[in-house]
Curated annotation (Swiss-Prot):
Residues forming coiled coils: none
A UniProt-annotated Pfam family: G3P_acyltransf
Protein name in UniProt: Glycerol-3-phosphate acyltransferase
Signal peptide: none
Function: Catalyzes the transfer of an acyl group from acyl-phosphate (acyl-PO(4)) to glycerol-3-phosphate (G3P) to form lysophosphatidic acid (LPA). This enzyme utilizes acyl-phosphate as fatty acyl donor, but not acyl-CoA or acyl-ACP.
The family this protein is said to belong to: Belongs to the PlsY family.
InterPro entries assigned: G3P_acylTferase_PlsY
Keywords: Cell inner membrane, Cell membrane, Lipid biosynthesis, Lipid metabolism, Membrane, Phospholipid biosynthesis, Phospholipid metabolism, Transferase, Transmembrane, Transmembrane helix
GO cellular component: plasma membrane
Main location: membrane
Compartments in which it is found: Cell inner membrane
Originating species: Burkholderia cenocepacia (strain HI2424)
Pathway per the UniProt entry: Lipid metabolism; phospholipid metabolism
EC assignment: 2.3.1.275
């Protein structure tokens, strides 16, 4: 019962879509209506409003971090923490408050990993930053980071074995790659947008709705 309650609370925390909330508060277009139509920081950046994108990134990462931190703070066992990690991640992917139309989970996963172990989170985030810096593809950076996160976990804590948190990290990585399946096709076809690109619809929306920021 304790695990179920913790997972439910985590799912509800994850269901808060900061991309939609921040955009609404700042008078910007709904990120689900332009660009990739993904409610995440990268798509919000396409509106031309960097402040909104940063707030979205921080908010999405924070909810992943706080869910796991609270589970640890209340002394829940590792199996409960593992379910909390997965639940907050699933909340972001399929938010009950937004008709189950969520983001791809990169920032939220990063927050979860930082709470699980700071070194694990930082190593994964650094991997994302390096790939994003050199290749300018947010999706490629996310995919590489997702692949390496379980590898970093093994280096830090050994093979998963009976460690439920390690299996949760692996599950999130698999889900994150699956959520990027459309991006994989675009990358292979050379049609993926680079970081900082503004599609016409997004640029128009940003000019009309986000020019005040």
């Amino acid at each position: 019962m304790q695990i179920l309650l913790a997972a439910l609370v985590a799912y509800l925390i994850g269901s808060v879509s900061f991309a939609v909330v921040v955009s609404s508060v700042m008078g910007l277009a709904d990120p689900r209506s332009y660009g990739s139509k993904n409610p995440g920081a990268t798509n919000v950046l396409r509106s031309g409003n960097k402040k909104a994108a940063i707030l979205t990134l921080v908010g999405d990462a924070f909810k992943g971090w706080i869910a796991v931190w609270l589970a640890r703070h209340f002394g829940l066992p590792d199996v409960a923490i593992a379910w909390v990690a997965i639940a907050v991640f699933l909340g972001h992917l399929y938010p009950v408050f937004f008709r189950f139309q969520g983001g791809k989970g990169v920032a939220t996963a990063a927050g979860v990993l930082l709470a699980v172990h700071p070194v694990l989170g930082l190593a994964t985030a650094l991997t994302w930053l390096i790939v994003a810096f050199f290749f300018r593809y947010s999706s490629l950076a996310a995919l590489v980071a997702a692949v390496f996160a379980p590898v970093f976990d093994v280096f830090l804590f050994g093979m998963p074995g009976h460690n439920p948190i390690a299996w949760a990290v692996l599950a999130m990585s698999v889900l994150l790659v699956w959520r990027h399946r459309g991006n994989i096709s675009k990358l292979l076809a050379g049609q993926e947008s680079r970081i900082g690109d503004k599609k016409k619809a997004a640029a128009d929306g940003g000019a009309q709705d986000g020019g005040k920021a």
